[in-house]
Amino acid sequence: MGCFHSREPTATGKTKKEEPTSAVKTNKEEKSSNYVSEPTTMEKIKKDDVYTIILIGDQATGKSSVLQRFKNNQFEVCHKPSPIIIDCFTKKIQIEGKKISLKCYDTAGQEKFRALSQSYYRCADGIMLFYDIANQKTFDNVGRWLEEVHRLAGPNVPILIIANKCDLNEKRVVNFNNAKKFADDKNIPIIEVSAKESLGVEEAFIKLASEINKTWKPLPDNETVTIGM
């Protein structure tokens, strides 16, 4: 699985952008759907830029809950690992008067799914890296995740570290000042959020989109990116 560029037009003369197909739950109109086994396509959006954001981090760091809060402004407690390996949806936002479509991929944190999740890095325009402020191990693993990102997505992809579950301050084991020093040393921004209390979630997505926007170079009209087998 990987990314490649295609310049071949469709029968209508318009290029199309293929969506991830392997064990992926897709959502064209922000509605839930089942696994897709056949490729799905979407005509390239002309008026909006499409930024692909990948959510990564250890299992149970709250990636899915943050995505649900951003998507539907709802909070769902996930007690069990999701059967979905990659969950995808698109949401439109506006940055400095510019319309942006954020295509967000929530990757499974389970080790057994890492190979599939990693294949999406190469197509990422930006990455959110999660840890749980009440779980020291998830923060200790941030360095390993960063190494993986730099190896697979390249050294220049914008990254935002997400210190999640800040509503659990009484259970905090990761001091934010220490985490910020770690992030500052690597020149990576960091933000605390809470999906439960709806704190900082939308701000985080806008912040990362703004970083992407600084160096964004859209594909030519006759060129598309494909993610798939």
Curated annotation (Swiss-Prot):
Stored InterPro entries: P-loop_NTPase (IPR027417), Rab_GTPases_membrane_traffic (IPR050209), Small_GTP-bd (IPR005225), Small_GTPase (IPR001806)
Keyword tags: GTP-binding, Lipoprotein, Myristate, Nucleotide-binding, Palmitate
Region of interest: Disordered: 1-39
PTM comment: Although this sequence lacks the C-terminal cysteine motifs subject to isoprenylation in other Rab proteins, it does have N-terminal myristoylation and S-palmitoylation sequence motifs.
Record GO cellular component, one term: membrane
Binding positions (GTP): 57-64, 106-110, 164-167
Gene Ontology MF, one: GTPase activity
Keyword Mitochondrion among UniProt keywords: no
Lipid-substituted positions (S-palmitoyl cysteine): C3
One protein family per Pfam: Ras
Family annotation (CDD domains): Rab
Annotated motif Effector region, positions: 79-88
Basic and acidic residues bias (residue ranges): 15-32
Keyword Transport listed: no
One GO BP annotation of this record: exocytosis
Gene3D superfamilies with a match to the protein in the record: P-loop containing nucleotide triphosphate hydrolases
Residue numbers with lipid attached (N-myristoyl glycine): G2
Record family assignment: Belongs to the small GTPase superfamily. Rab family.
PANTHER family according to UniProt: DRAB11-RELATED (PTHR47979)
Protein name: Ras-related protein RabZ
Origin species: Dictyostelium discoideum (Social amoeba)
Organism lineage: Eukaryota, Amoebozoa, Evosea, Eumycetozoa, Dictyostelia
